[in-house]
């Protein structure tokens, strides 16, 4: 539920499960970002929700993180799905749908992550497996509306699909 509908509470739960606490997980996130060459990124939360001036990134750094994530088969499998179902420990079943408006509406386009806060605006990191066989990542940040985010992303990915 973290990558398909973008549930922020799932990010916190995963952080606590993996590292025992959110601060410890955020420290790991920042270490990994540095290893990936993200020079203009500092995380303060595992879910991207505004956390003051200590939480920031750039489109370039998000693209680096997306390229790394795309190499993981499980990530590729998840972000290609339009919906998912999970069963809780007490047996309740929950179905959720993607927040990626392009998934299923634009050929060879897959999601990676949607986001929105008042500070960041409407954001999306997506990708296309272009006709030339290459994979291109797009990052849109600061969209004034959700529709603007999708229009900008569509234009970027359509352009990438024309590259030779």
Annotate each predicted stretch with a short phrase.
Residues 21-164:
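Penicillin-recognizing serine hydrolase domain
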